[in-house]
């Protein structure tokens, strides 16, 4: 019998890097509302008392960058100097320029179906049947812990919580099946006055226990709640934040490979983002069809070229049909050209700010989480 541990982490919407991601995606959403053909690459930097928004944007839209940035920061919960960061009073600097014409000529075409990829690169998508959302369990529960932290903070149930937090979940596997939780780490920013006893009790009873399956917890499970003891200084006052610094949190928590490209602040013509979403869509439909228990897709592109330069399917020995057949089915049922996948997943809509915290995958409200091709794949593979 083989046994092993696997760990994934998540961070809250108030983590400095996630503040930056949410600002970048809020800018993208506001532009897409006005100009569906916009080209957006928006980067944000946050530090004590300031937010810098920059990047390359080509659009006919007008967005009030300063007020939008302040609103995002306040919505997260940084709206008073006691938090160490205040959306009402921080400086907001705008350093946005235009996209290079050299890139534009490779992307835009008279026939939209010939639209080239905005850059070269590799992208991965993954799915596994170990959770109901066909995502790895460790990252799924790490995200849910962070969502719960925000819920009880914003509702006032634990009024001493502050926006910055991190979680980490270590699961025990035997013969590739989860048998329990080995360890949970949860660090959360808090107000000055709360005692360590009240903090530990509140986090355990209101965040950890309601989220993790009780049958996975035992007297051997280790809990590390604010293990340094004090976490008053947090958010951008504690660390600077940058767009695109949490790419493993954003995806599969290390359970699958990553092509290296970040998502937030990029419009769907950037295959770093849109092709990674399409790869997840393909992998999830293959698993939902029962063609594999685990599936990883790799796509690659060349700048200015429409068709992917490669498609790879890996099922880790769990496939019900040959990987070569799966590759041919992917080519048959999924249009993975940049314009094709944008149409397939309806990506020209203002949905991106919501992706920028708690993971881009495993959340049913996003179009790349549909399993509408599963039945067709199953029939075509000869399993029905």
Swiss-Prot record:
Subcellular location(s) per record: Cytoplasm
Binding site for L-methionine: 56, 99, 239, 270
Pathway recorded for this protein: Amino-acid biosynthesis; S-adenosyl-L-methionine biosynthesis; S-adenosyl-L-methionine from L-methionine: step 1/1
Species this chain originates from: Haemophilus influenzae (strain PittGG)
Primary localisation category: cytoplasm
Cited function: Catalyzes the formation of S-adenosylmethionine (AdoMet) from methionine and ATP. The overall synthetic reaction is composed of two sequential steps, AdoMet formation and the subsequent tripolyphosphate hydrolysis which occurs prior to release of AdoMet from the enzyme.
Gene: metK
Subunit structure: Homotetramer; dimer of dimers.
Amino acids binding Mg(2+): 17
Region (Flexible loop) location: 99-109
EC id: 2.5.1.6
Full protein name: S-adenosylmethionine synthase
Name of the top EC class for this enzyme: transferase
Pfam families: S-AdoMet_synt_C, S-AdoMet_synt_M, S-AdoMet_synt_N
Cofactor(s) the protein needs: Mg(2+); K(+)
UniProt keyword list: ATP-binding, Cytoplasm, Magnesium, Metal-binding, Nucleotide-binding, One-carbon metabolism, Potassium, Transferase
Homology family: Belongs to the AdoMet synthase family.
Organism lineage: Bacteria, Pseudomonadati, Pseudomonadota, Gammaproteobacteria, Pasteurellales
Chain positions recorded as ATP binding sites: 15, 164-166, 230-231, 239, 245-246, 262, 266
């Amino acid at each position: 019998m083989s046994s092993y541990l696997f760990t994934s982490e998540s961070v809250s919407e108030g983590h400095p890097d996630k503040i930056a991601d949410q600002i970048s995606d809020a800018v993208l959403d506001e532009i897409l509302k006005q100009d569906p053909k916009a080209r957006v690459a928006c980067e944000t930097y946050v530090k004590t008392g300031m937010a810098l928004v920059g990047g390359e944007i080509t659009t006919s839209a007008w967005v009030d960058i300063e007020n939008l940035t302040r609103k995002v920061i306040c919505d997260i919960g940084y709206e008073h100097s006691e938090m160490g960061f205040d959306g009402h009073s921080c400086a907001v600097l705008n350093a946005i320029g235009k996209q290079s014409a050299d890139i534009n000529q490779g992307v835009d075409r008279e026939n939209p179906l010939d639209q080239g990829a905005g850059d070269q690169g590799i992208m991965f998508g993954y799915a596994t049947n170990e959770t109901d959302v066909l995502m790895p369990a460790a990252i799924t529960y790490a995200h849910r812990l962070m969502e719960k932290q925000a819920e009880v903070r914003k509702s006032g149930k634990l009024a001493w919580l502050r926006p910055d937090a991190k979680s980490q979940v270590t699961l025990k596997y035997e013969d590739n099946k989860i048998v329990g939780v080995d360890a949970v780490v949860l660090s959360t920013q808090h107000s000055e006055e709360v005692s360590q006893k009240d903090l530990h009790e509140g986090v355990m009873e209101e965040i950890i226990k309601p989220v993790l399956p009780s049958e996975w917890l035992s007297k051997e499970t280790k809990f590390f709640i604010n293990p340094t003891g004090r976490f008053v200084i947090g958010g951008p006052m504690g660390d600077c934040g940058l767009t695109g610094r949490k790419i493993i949190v954003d995806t599969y928590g290390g359970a699958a490979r990553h092509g290296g490209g970040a998502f937030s602040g990029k419009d769907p013509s950037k295959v770093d983002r849109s092709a990674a979403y399409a790869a997840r869509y393909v992998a999830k439909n293959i698993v939902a069809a029962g063609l594999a228990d685990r599936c990883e897709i790799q796509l690659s592109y060349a700048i200015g070229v429409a068709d992917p330069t490669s498609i790879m399917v890996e099922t880790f020995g769990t496939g019900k049909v040959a990987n070569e057949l799966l590759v041919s089915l992917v080519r048959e049922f999924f249009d993975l050209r940049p314009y094709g996948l944008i149409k397939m997943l309806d990506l020209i809509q203002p949905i991106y700010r919501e992706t920028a915290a708690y993971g881009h995958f495993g959340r049913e409200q996003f179009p790349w989480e549909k399993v509408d091709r599963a039945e067709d794949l199953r029939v075509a593979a000869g399993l029905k």
